[in-house]
């Protein structure tokens, strides 16, 4: 069993605010704007004044596409160009990842393995490795040093597992994982990225 860096995996997390910010930022940055409403100038029809300005006793209107009318345009609606992006500094993201990893480590949800046991790029090879670890086949996050063709072939069709490199770790995936499996050779890259000794 490899020793985990206490600066990454044993932080005392007394305030979850940064983890929450990073989690929400991930969701916001994954969001795209598709909803769009029609303003009064974009709704078809309504070119004719519905009734004369004076003498009817009714309120004056210039178009049946006024936003307060049924079938009228929408005032202040979605334009389809909304920007939901939330920004966090690189340092804040890394600290949030370390806090999330520490929280998972406290719950004994992190396991270290020598390798995934992949020889022929078969899914059953990875399934066997995970079965030997006695982990529940649900929401497993696997951290590997590098992605190669065999690894991709062996893991792409496993619905309950997600494979990432250390520098692609994020708070959303960590917090949603029931088990995090880290390949031993990925630990040094993870240390270097999070502690900032070098850019991996």
Residue ranges and their predicted role:
Residues 40-77:
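Glycine/serine-rich anion-binding loops at beta->alpha junctions
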